[in-house]
From Swiss-Prot:
<dbReference type="Pfam" id="PF10502">
    <property type="entry name" value="Peptidase_S26"/>
</dbReference>
<protein>
    <recommendedName>
        <fullName>Signal peptidase I</fullName>
        <ecNumber>3.4.21.89</ecNumber>
    </recommendedName>
</protein>
<feature type="active site">
    <location>
        <position position="45"/>
    </location>
</feature>
<keyword id="KW-1003">Cell membrane</keyword>
<comment type="similarity">
    <text>Belongs to the peptidase S26 family.</text>
</comment>
<dbReference type="InterPro" id="IPR019533">
    <property type="entry name" value="Peptidase_S26"/>
</dbReference>
<dbReference type="InterPro" id="IPR019758">
    <property type="entry name" value="Pept_S26A_signal_pept_1_CS"/>
</dbReference>
<feature type="transmembrane region" description="Helical">
    <location>
        <begin position="21"/>
        <end position="41"/>
    </location>
</feature>
<keyword id="KW-0472">Membrane</keyword>
<dbReference type="GO" id="GO:0004252">
    <property type="term" value="F:serine-type endopeptidase activity"/>
</dbReference>
<dbReference type="GO" id="GO:0005886">
    <property type="term" value="C:plasma membrane"/>
</dbReference>
<dbReference type="InterPro" id="IPR019757">
    <property type="entry name" value="Pept_S26A_signal_pept_1_Lys-AS"/>
</dbReference>
<feature type="active site">
    <location>
        <position position="108"/>
    </location>
</feature>
<keyword id="KW-0997">Cell inner membrane</keyword>
<keyword id="KW-0812">Transmembrane</keyword>
<keyword id="KW-0378">Hydrolase</keyword>
<feature type="topological domain" description="Periplasmic">
    <location>
        <begin position="42"/>
        <end position="266"/>
    </location>
</feature>
Length: 266
């Protein structure tokens, strides 16, 4: 027979468990909103630095906070501009909302700062009329068999990274047209971005344009998981998900897990 004391203890235990769960959920939400957020990359515009279906760890605090960087609050105009703002650095890989489509997120490399003059001539970046250091270091063949020339580029602040250009035969097939551009003058408060996959990136050279600082969400840091194929898809049934589990596991790119996005020691 259950006594009143037993019932009271049971109720207390249930309440304690509920409050513990609520506390854990609140902490997780705060971390997601203020500290870090994972992102999945759906396109190859940053190939081969970042591949399709790479899962990226990014830090929210790197540039401070704006309406667009605070998860779950980006639809509420809490304030203008950024709070606790920290200036981005040339060469950062940034997650942001493109001004021409605020419903999606892009990830690109920051090349031009406010006040900069940017131009590409024969695939070489010129910043304020000075070309950056660019050296061909090898080739890269993607998982779908497309071959790229691989270059090591050094920005004026000393930041180095790899960029990729379609090999000549593929350049003809995919209509390479981004290697020579007009001159871009970066306005105050805005930034110029490029994809590391230079011939296959929708960036500031084409439709994207300049990106306001307010649109920055986070700074990408490293890859925490990576697969060649997606397992989850809202358009397929449960049985198909079960059938896709084995090939999905086999498609995990173990060599990319915990890869630092700023490491050029290859």
């Amino acid at each position: 027979m259950q006594t009143d004391n037993t019932k009271s203890n049971t109720n207390k235990t249930a309440k304690q468990e509920w409050w513990s769960c609520a506390f854990v959920i609140c902490i997780a939400l705060l971390i997601r909103i203020l500290i870090m957020e994972p992102f999945t990359v759906p396109t190859g515009s940053m190939k081969a630095t970042i591949l399709e279906n790479d899962y990226i760890f990014s830090t929210k605090y790197s540039y401070g906070y704006s309406n667009y960087s605070l998860s779950f609050f980006d639809f509420i105009p809490l304030f203008k501009g950024r709070i606790f703002a920290r200036e981005p650095e040339r060469g950062d890989i940034v997650v942001f909302r493109p001004p021409n489509d605020m419903n999606v997120r892009y990830i690109k490399r920051l090349i031009g700062l406010p006040g900069d003059k940017i131009q590409l001539i024969d695939d070489v970046i010129y910043i304020n009329d000075k070309k950056i250091e660019r050296t061909e270091v090898g080739t890269y063949t993607s998982e779908d068999g497309i071959k790229y020339l691989k270059f090591k580029e050094t920005l004026p602040n000393g930041r180095t990274y790899f960029s990729y250009k379609l090999a000549p035969i593929f350049s003809v097939i995919y209509n390479d047209r981004y290697g020579n551009t007009d001159v871009f003058y970066v306005p105050e408060g805005k930034y110029f971005f490029l994809g590391d996959n230079r011939d296959q990136s929708n960036d500031s050279r084409v439709n994207l344009g300049f990106v306001p600082f307010e649109n920055f969400i986070a700074k990408a840091q490293f890859i925490w998981f990576s697969t060649k194929i997606n397992w989850w898809d809202n358009d397929i049934g449960v049985m198909n998900l079960v059938l896709r589990l084995k090939p999905w596991i086999e498609s995990v790119r173990l060599n990319r897990i915990f890869r630092n996005l700023y490491n050029t020691d290859e």
